[in-house]
Amino acid sequence: MASLDSPLLILLVLAVLGIVSHNMTITLAVLFLLVVRFTPLNHFFPWVEKYGLSFGILVLTIGVLAPIASGKIAASEVVQAFLNWKSLLAVIIGIAVSWLGGRGVSLMSNQPSVVAGLLVGTVIGVALLRGVPVGPLIAAGLLSLLIGKG
């Protein structure tokens, strides 16, 4: 009897969940990892494991800052964020969410066993609750408040 390739099985289940939930991010991530795994690129796994999360945060930060860099958001709008109570509240919430995300990165790095649960929870939230797939770091941050940074 052939041995079960459990990492492949998990990736395929995540791909199916990504497709069913219309979560293109998870689907493309799984396809990328499958290509890396089954080609000579597989020697890049240690790099992806070590730097992938940091690289992803870098790309996300570039995306967030792009409207400022392109001039779509003017400097005056950034200043206005501190003058209106709704915008000031948005700044405070942004700070809190960034802090939670930082805790999430730490938790995911120190306790990788929680990553699968966070991913499954995110996919279920997208599929059943019409959520958006932006939550694993924040979810990990919230989890870290409950179980410790660890």
From Swiss-Prot:
TM regions (residue ranges): 8-28, 51-71, 81-101, 114-134
GO cellular component, one term: plasma membrane
Location (main, coarse): membrane
Keyword Coiled coil (UniProt): no
Keywords, comma-separated and alphabetical: Cell membrane, Membrane, Transmembrane, Transmembrane helix
Membrane disposition: Multi-pass membrane protein
Disulfide bonds: none
InterPro entries the record matches: UPF0756_TM
Phylogenetic lineage: Bacteria, Pseudomonadati, Pseudomonadota, Gammaproteobacteria, Enterobacterales
Family: Belongs to the UPF0756 family.
PANTHER family: UPF0756 MEMBRANE PROTEIN YEAL
Location of this chain's protein in the cell: Cell membrane
Designated name of the protein: UPF0756 membrane protein Dd703_1075
